[in-house]
């Protein structure tokens, strides 16, 4: 977040180079983006909603997404993943998101990997505290004072419809 040069080099320039290489070899690219590309003011964001990142990480991911979108043989996954176990001592009670652990994310990814376009993948829409409390009983409540937008959760309608095909 604070090292802008590194964010640009890794997320934007690196992804642009990867897209060019995939284009030369006609290889599909699967790009992992983030729910942080959405503004976080209204929640329930669909894949075709306007994007407006609220931090440098989101901006760097959106920059990378732009290159990937130019290459039609691609899948962009906008995800809201977190570590397992939940490692933080505190969790926000006033920030709603779609946290999903990596292992659950992979199960979904394997089912949608052949699709193209943009897909949101995440877990149930709930506060970070509600999510954390299920896995870490002693997690403390905390109010966000603007560290995160309050409504960064995504619509999972598209991915759920795709999963019904399996």
What are these model-derived regions, one by one?
Residues 108-154:
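Mid/C-terminal beta-alpha module of Rossmann-like enzyme folds, strongest
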Residues 8, 12, 49-62, 95-103, ...:
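Short-chain dehydrogenase/reductase
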Residues 1-10, 21-23:
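NAD(P)H-binding glycine-rich loop region in Rossmannoid oxidoreductase-like domains
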Residues 29-33, 75-78, 98, 120:
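Structural signature of the Rossmann-like NAD(P)-dependent dehydrogenase/reductase core
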Residues 16-52:
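Conserved Rossmann-fold NAD(P)-dependent oxidoreductase catalytic core, especially the SDR/UDP-sugar
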Residues 52-80:
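Active-site Tyr-X1-5-Lys
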Residues 79-114:
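Substrate-positioning beta->alpha
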